[in-house]
Amino acid sequence: MEVPRKTKILIAVIIFCIPGYISVTWSQDFNFHGQVSAWGTALKLNSDWNNSTGLRYIPQLNYSYTFDENNLLNGEILLNTFYNSDFKSDDFNFKLYRAIVRYTTTQSETQIGLQKINFGPAQLLRTLMWFDSVDPRDPLKLTDGVYGVRYKYSFMNNSIAWLWGLYGNDKTKGYELFPTAKRIPEFGGRYQLQIPLGEAGLTLNTREVNTGIFNYRENRYALDGRWDIGIGAWFESALQQSQTTLIQFQWNKMITLGGDYTLSVGNGIYFLVEHMTSIASDRMWGDNSDRKISAIMATYPLSVLDNIAVQEYYDWEGKNIYQYYQWQRTYDNWIINLGLFHYPKNAGGIFEGSSTAPSAGYGAQLMLVYNY
């Protein structure tokens, strides 16, 4: 039986409060803060202008208990409450955003609950976007989490081992076409190590996929690396195997190549370039269908408070250009963000799209963010 969403929230709150009954002889600390954001968007799609407004509130409660100098128990719970209106219809939603209990020692970290799991050096076109869906255009960088347990161990040679087990995630994550089968956990791990002039990582994950008609086993294997060789250079590569003959393509390959550099002009112009190729085939080394996307980002700090940025994407298959321009002013607690965007009318899936980051059409968005 699937656990209702309200029950999940209640369980998370109870788990979060349990440490409050632990012996008061331990050093303990609670703190509460949050984020309030409001935005207005003017979007022209086809021949019509569509205006919308939104309001989001994310309260966050943190706690920590120190057993001794080498053992720490802490956690956090965040709720996501938002309202969005396009003046024709209203959308109000309330959901659990994060609920984490974390136990840390000098070399290990164990984390359980609704959490964010991400890795890899790419920033715009992320081959290793397996468990999140962070949109680089979104000023808030929000993404749904996953329910599970994640363990990290840091070795004395600065290498890091990750292990995770996920359960109860009934929605698609990252680039997934189908969700994970209910009541069947998925498992994975990652090993990061230092190499000359940089670092590299090897990642594995396996899960049971539910298409709605049948299930099959999916295995993913990934390799990534980053180097500092005067410029920053990195890659992410992944191979996905679907153990079934009932889908058209049993193999999917993705690779991202990227680099960045800061020019000593004025306050410093930061450039980043990435290119992603994805291939689907019925054989491991086949090439039945492919797609290529390139991206460039440039940022420049006008002052201590002001920063401007531009992101441009090119879809080689659809020959479409996606443009996003941003100005942001940052105070101690306030952020003002103005975004201008120009996307194809019929976007082909580069961006998923949301109320704070449209995926098609052109227009502008003003957002105010208050952190306390």
Short names for language-model regions:
Residues 38-44, 67, 79-85, 105-107, ...:
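Transmembrane beta-strands of outer-membrane beta-barrel pores
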Residues 64-161, 166, 345:
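Outer membrane beta-barrel
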Residues 59-65, 98-103, 149-153, 189-193, ...:
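Residues on the lipid-exposed face of transmembrane beta-strands in outer-membrane beta-barrel proteins
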Residues 329, 334-335, 342, 358-372:
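Outer-membrane beta-barrel "beta-signal"
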Residues 49-57, 92-97, 143-147, 183-187, ...:
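Residues that define the transmembrane beta-barrel architecture of outer-membrane proteins
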Residues 30, 69-75, 107-110, 158-162, ...:
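Repeated loop/turn-to-beta-strand initiation elements of outer-membrane beta-barrel proteins
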Residues 26-47, 73-75, 159:
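Transmembrane beta-strand segments of Gram-negative outer membrane beta-barrel proteins
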